[in-house]
Amino acid sequence: MAKELKVYEIRITLNGSKPPIWRKVAVSSDITLGELHEVIQIAMGWTNSHMHQFILQSKNPKPVQQKQPNSTVTVEKKVIELPDGRKGYVISTKPCDDSVTPKPVESALPWFNTSARNFVTKTTPWGDPTEMEGEDEKTVTLGEVCPKVKSKLIYEYDFGDDWEHTIEVQKIVTPEPAGKYPICLSGKKACPPEDCGGIWGYYEMLDAVGNPKHDSHKEMIEWIGDHFDSDAFDLEEVNAILAKWRKG
């Protein structure tokens, strides 16, 4: 018997942000991690210009052995230990061909679509795909890795700036008969600009932009412009983009 589909209400929080930058999203339990990656990009306001990975926390993680031969995209699932002592799985997709670039997604922040998209960088080779071991995120569902309320996983975006997000399941409910998922339910604060140096670089940028006497004020204004509002979040705009995404 097929498992009954549920709706997961998840909170996505950008780690290190104060006050928290977060989104609450309702998704189907059968959404794959590959699809969830795209939903996170849209809901947060990223542009999918860099690589990503999911870290699935586990008390007793065991690596999965799986070959992915003759592919231009390698996938890897391995056990890692984070600096704070946490251990978990990593499921990630890694292009091994430097001609492959991540596919941009439409952003909820209009200025991203006209500027940051032009700065999509090409990836570097990651090695022989026949030697990689792992599991494709496109074959793993959220319901499989987060089976209950309070289940968590880490989503890391951009291995240079290291934007780490915590995804927590807050509710598991029955789908509404006319419900359309995914849908963003709420959120706070704007997404940081791409390539600004991570969470610490972002707050340094805000300090510089807000202080005309700051040594980098002029430089930051020229880079970010005078229209960036760190408090802005447009729920309707996010859901309009998610509606397009649902249609493929």
Per-segment meaning from a language model:
Residues 1-248:
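Short linear regulatory motifs enriched in tryptophan with gly/pro/ser
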